[in-house]
């Protein structure tokens, strides 16, 4: 499964377990297909902050899936 599709599905299952900012940024990146720069401007945070938030969300979603296994 393509990474973007997989993360999008994981967001549907586990998104509410992320922080509000992680969820917002991840949804904009994976579901709305916005760039890091566009998200940074919308969220009023640095581009690097957007990237870090996405990476933390990806890690958290992966951890939740490995423990709960609802998607697989």
What are the language-model segments listed below?
Residues 9-18:
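Short amphipathic alpha-helical boundary/capping segments
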Residues 20-32:
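Short amphipathic alpha helix immediately N-terminal
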Residues 53-56:
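Residues within the DNA-recognition helix of helix-turn-helix
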Residues 58-65:
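C-terminal flanking helix
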Residues 66-72:
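Short, basic, alpha-helical segments at the C-terminal edge of helix-turn-helix-like DNA-binding modules
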Residues 25, 38-40, 50:
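Hydrophobic positions on the alpha-helical face of helix-turn-helix-like DNA-binding modules
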